[in-house]
A protein has these predicted regions:
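N-terminal alpha/beta PP-like core and its mobile active-site loop of ThDP/TPP-dependent enzymes
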Residues: 1-182
Length: 182
């Protein structure tokens, strides 16, 4: 998982990780959390037991979805082969848009060994997903006021500036304000 993170960060492309169920699933948890914290786009694909065996403590059954929900942008367990293409399209869209981050797809054995016609269409909109949050004008006005009142303002920024493509805006802001940046 850490190699996929390195690839994603160095290339600005999606890193992909494929692991087995059980120990494979548990071993990616730290990497998923790290990718979430660092805004690294990852697609984590994990194997899982058959649908009929879910919840029975079957050999190497691990609730990756339950573990990954709080540390990823989106998770889905895929139980039917016909759900594979739409789930992958949605996962890639979510991982790469807005603040990038990890998404997790948990493929049951049924989804892995079944077959369905391959119909893939790129996802470009999800009704309940807002990749770019709305700006609150009151918060912006308050920030301007705080900066104006500050005797020695300093801008400390990270890779979010690069991820959002705001390098020019940042440089214009600090030049106009005469504010040092780190």
């Amino acid at each position: 998982i850490h190699a996929a993170q390195g690839y994603a960060r160095a290339s600005s492309r999606l890193g992909v990780v494929i692991v087995t169920s059980g120990p494979g699933a548990t071993n990616v948890i730290t990497g998923i959390a790290d990718a979430m914290i660092d805004s690294t786009p990852l697609l984590v694909i994990c194997g899982q037991v058959g649908t009929a065996a879910l919840g029975t403590d079957a050999f190497q059954e691990t609730d990756l979805i339950g573990m990954a929900v709080p540390i990823s942008k989106w998770t889905m367990q895929i139980r039917r082969p016909e759900d594979v293409a739409p789930a992958v399209a949605k996962a890639v869209y979510i991982a790469m848009t807005g603040r990038p981050g990890p998404v997790v797809l948990d493929f049951t054995k049924d989804a892995q060994i079944g077959s369905a016609p391959f119909i893939y269409s790129k996802c470009s909109f999800i009704r309940s997903y807002l990749p770019v949050p709305e700006t609150d004008p009151e918060s912006v006005a308050k920030a301007v006021e705080l900066i104006d009142e500050s005797s020695r303002p300093l801008v400390v920024c990270g890779q979010g500036v690069i991820l959002s493509g705001a390098e020019k805006e940042l440089m214009e802001f600090v030049r106009k304000g005469g504010i040092p940046v780190a």
